[in-house]
Regions:
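Conserved ABC ATPase "signature" region
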Residues: 4-7, 11-29
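Conserved ABC ATPase signature
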Residues: 33-37
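Hydrophobic anchor residue at the start of the ABC signature
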Residues: 47, 75
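Catalytic Walker B motif of ABC-type/P-loop ATPase nucleotide-binding domains
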Residues: 58-61
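Helix N-cap at the start of a conserved alpha-helix in ABC-type nucleotide-binding domains
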Residues: 69-71, 100
Length: 143
């Protein structure tokens, strides 16, 4: 249905759907309604729907949120495979995900774009470590 909405020819839809279902590892769930899929499986299905039909601009809002590490990596590989020739705008809270997938990374804070650039640029400009600030308050507890 989504492929048809995006203008795919009827003869190409079945093959494209089969390929996507294989790519998101949902072959054994082909005949299940989406409401019966797990949260991770629903996310995989959503990513497949986003890419089917050859869309040139794709928005993905935290596509791997709530997934375990292996499922996240699986989706990452799929995104790498299908992103060529497309503009993919992806939101994430995982810097490793942005680093692996992003050609350009934008960092937002309080609803505003704080900085933008390649992973290398951001690491050179802002560093790769963490800052830890510890403040000790005098508790005036008698010894």
């Amino acid at each position: 249905m989504f492929a048809a909405f995006k203008g795919m020819n009827g003869s190409d839809i079945d093959a494209a759907v089969r390929t996507m279902i294989e790519d998101v590892d949902l072959v054994d769930k082909t005949d299940y309604p989406a409401k019966d899929l797990s949260g991770g499986q629903k996310r995989k299905l959503s990513v497949a729907i986003a890419f089917i039909g050859g869309s040139k601009l794709i928005y993905l809002d935290e596509p791997t949120s709530g997934m375990d590490t292996s499922a996240r990596r699986y989706i990452w590989e799929m995104l790498k495979k299908y992103k060529d020739g497309k503009i993919v705008v992806l939101t994430t809270h995982f810097m490793d995900e942005a680093d692996f997938l992003g050609d350009r990374i934008g960092i937002m804070g309080e609803g505003k774009l704080i900085c933008c650039g390649s992973s290398v640029f951001l690491k050179n400009k802002f560093g790769v470590g963490y800052n830890l600030t510890i403040v000790k308050e005098n508790t005036n507890i008698p010894s």
